[in-house]
Amino acid sequence: GDTAGPGGMVRALRTIPMFVEIAEAIRDYAPKAWVINYTNPMSLCVKTLYHVFPEIKAFGCCHEVFGTQKLLAQIAERELGLTNIAREDIVVNVLGLNHFTWFDRASYKGIDLFPVYRHFIETHFEEGFEEKDNNWMNSTFACAHRVKFDLFQKYGWIAAAGDRHLAEFMPPIYLKDPQTVASWKFGLTTVTWRKEDLKKRLEKSKRLVSGEEQVELNPSGEEGILLIKALCGLTRVISNVNIPNTAGQIPNLPKSAVVETNAVFSRDSIAPVYAGNLTEEIRQLMLPHVMNHEEYLTCQ
């Protein structure tokens, strides 16, 4: 894991000192710059930046919400007999912590998707949802979304992250042993895979620098460029973002927590959208992690 539990803690202890240096450099040399973070553990990285330089203009971007919007679009196509539903047309209210984020509302062109999602789960819980021509066992990052489905049945909201991340927050249920992981049909990224992936990336970087390979400019599905355009005043964008809860966008979490909600991006401005309260059950699941973030940061 890279967010919660022992794996998240160790990664945080490695990463926080580097983010202290980054925050100090921004404070000293570019205090008015916008800082976009994509590094995990997301909440702690953003929290460190603000801890060192409270006036920093920083936010964290994560694509897990996009993946859940895509899942809802695909389920809606199957259940409603529609085609070509764009991920961007799935309107959601986002609230939670990064990688433990939830939707309490989701719709497509005015159609409430909660009943649609519920019906799909009732009829496909055991096999889950597998994308076309993609066997979950063949991919490190694949999942059949059964953890999401189980959490929906337990708590009534849509968990909006990959199953391998959601499982980090509830290890006794989903990470008990390899057999348990296999039964929930999600993959884990191993140390061996990470090392091999890094090797491939470094080799590719060398080829790009030498000119042996050309840079291919293709859309990645991330929204970073759109957000930069909005901050430059060229457009207005609403997207999910990780920033401190200082505006009380989630009232029943501490204002010191870094939370994930929607926000409005416009010229030199990020305005968090009021997301509302978490249910008490889900809040109790999150509070230990909020407290852990405080402890990890202050123990450095």
List the predicted regions and their residue ranges.
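Long, compositionally biased stretches enriched for glycine and/or charged residues
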Residues: L80-Q300
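Rossmann-fold dinucleotide-binding core
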Residues: Y38-K109, F114
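Alpha-helical scaffold segments in soluble metabolic enzymes
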Residues: E21, A25, T48, G67, ...
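Short, surface-exposed connector motifs at secondary-structure boundaries
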Residues: A25-W34, H51-K57
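A short alpha-helix capping/helix-coil boundary motif
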Residues: D2-A4, A25-I26, L49-H51, Y274-G276
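Rossmann-like NAD(P)-binding element
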Residues: G1-K32
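Conserved aromatic-histidine-acidic binding/catalytic patches
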Residues: G7-R14, A33-N37, I56, G60, ...
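Conserved structured core elements
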Residues: L13-I16, V20, T39-S43, C62, ...
